């Protein structure tokens, strides 16, 4: 007896799935978007469940019929002989897709189908199946389209990509059947038969390596689980199923090839090993913690297959270009004689590889359209992103400007014991970046391009920027960090954009300071305020210093090293802990300093403490939920300054600073206090090209203005 089936798959795998299913004995009747229709005997059905590496679900089509209204759907489901599929003591769940004029809600549609099944069994023997939406023994699919209802039974009960070996995954997991599709497109079964090795340099939780091992060792993916819904099917033949399982186990063969997965993250490597152990292939594979630039082939020929990170937004894509350039260089330099298959969603990143692809295949990683680039790594496939590749005329102008800035600012920075400074700030308008040096790292902040600039132009400039910066500044591509700077609103300025927690120690005069170049848009150190911080390094010992909106308290570190007693107030616990770490790094005794987590406005209203020097550097705007009110510095600066002046000793000094470019100081403040605009004195050499980076004022009581 033959059964009608629909086997679903991820978008883009339809014809690859068709070939696989034909090889397993399915008589294919139609290929449709995201699936294949066909007919099969019971042994073939069992083999599909055991051996398909590409399928999502295997659905046994039960019946179809015309149905536009609720009553028609119910009648079709009541009339069907459900006892030929399962008995009343089984648990069920319904997945409903589609709609009609009357049935517009999938939950409502599922309810009608369920009621029809229940009514059928009640009419048959007075009993009914129970519903279990979480883990049903019988999963029924109902699809209503063009007034035709099609109902099917999910023979396995879950998507076949859920092999059972992956309990946890990495940050961007690749579905097992998509990984299998990558390997099939790359001709891995044929290459493995010829003795080729395999290496995934971005292995993550090990999916590609594990799937490759299962293919090469002829391990049926359906063997790993024994909780298929088949066992609850009324027509299930357990003896035949066990016979085919045994045959599948007997087909497993020893491996004569080497399969290696590497990743820079040691924790994810531990996870990959655990997954491989659950898959039963741990003795067949090797997982090591290794950075990309340390990867080397262990054999003369093999397949490099990987799913490197790829961003969906322009800023993310740009940041990944150096990684892809390094991947291309590594492949070309070290893996001659090998094949490669690289999956990415970005043509820009594919181009950054610098290598010519023999073939491209469209695959979908979840909803994201990707391309699998298959390459032959040989001397004939010349690398186009070599360090000495010629620059365009515009890129050469950028190179010249960066080289000029570097020659000037490096000497100045060395002389002043500074290891972090701005080297470029959109000097050439067509390359709208700010570039900051932190030791031997470069942070590139891309100003968001106007909507009028086509995406391809913006991407071209980004690629040229990333081509030029390492050459002109002598920075290793791995030490380029790219961010996209845009006008920030409210709490966005302090929100995380990553979670690497990688810290770097930089030097500024006598102070050592902690920066984080990856996790936030800002790094923990505002470079433009350097001269203000160095001013505080000249304070007299015992000076009572208040740093309001202190951020990571880098200004207070300078003051404390001079012997001042500091009070540091900020709403963020994260930054206050960072501030304390800055103090510890400089061997400053924390017991002489205060770190207070408060809304600065509220704290200044209530405190009775007095200070000799106050540094007030609030954000331009903040609407943090933890604040009592929205902060708008143009609107609120008068009240903030008045509150700060109340906390000064009679001969004290307030330094007020803001990065709001269009800031205008309220004239009445000059009538009440002695106010001096000291902005020019606070702009250091590296910010001379952008003198409006901030505004800074020295404010004292009038009778101390001349002191």
From Swiss-Prot:
Q: Name one GO molecular function term.
A: rRNA (guanine-N7-)-methyltransferase activity
Q: Which UniProt keywords apply?
A: Cytoplasm, Methyltransferase, RNA-binding, rRNA processing, S-adenosyl-L-methionine, Transferase
Kindly give the InterPro entries that the UniProt entry links to this protein.
Answer: 23SrRNA_methyltr_KL, DNA_methylase_N6_adenine_CS, RlmKL-like_Mtase, RlmKL-like_Mtase_CS, RlmL_1st, SAM-dep_methyl-trfase, SAM-dependent_MTases_sf, THUMP_dom
**Gene3D superfamilies in the record, alphabetically?**
3.30.2130.30, RNA methyltransferase domain (HRMD) like, Vaccinia Virus protein VP39
GO CC terms in record: cytoplasm
Q: What is its EC number?
A: 2.1.1.173, 2.1.1.264
Give a short account of what the protein does: Specifically methylates the guanine in position 2445 (m2G2445) and the guanine in position 2069 (m7G2069) of 23S rRNA.
Q: What protein is this chain from?
A: Ribosomal RNA large subunit methyltransferase K/L
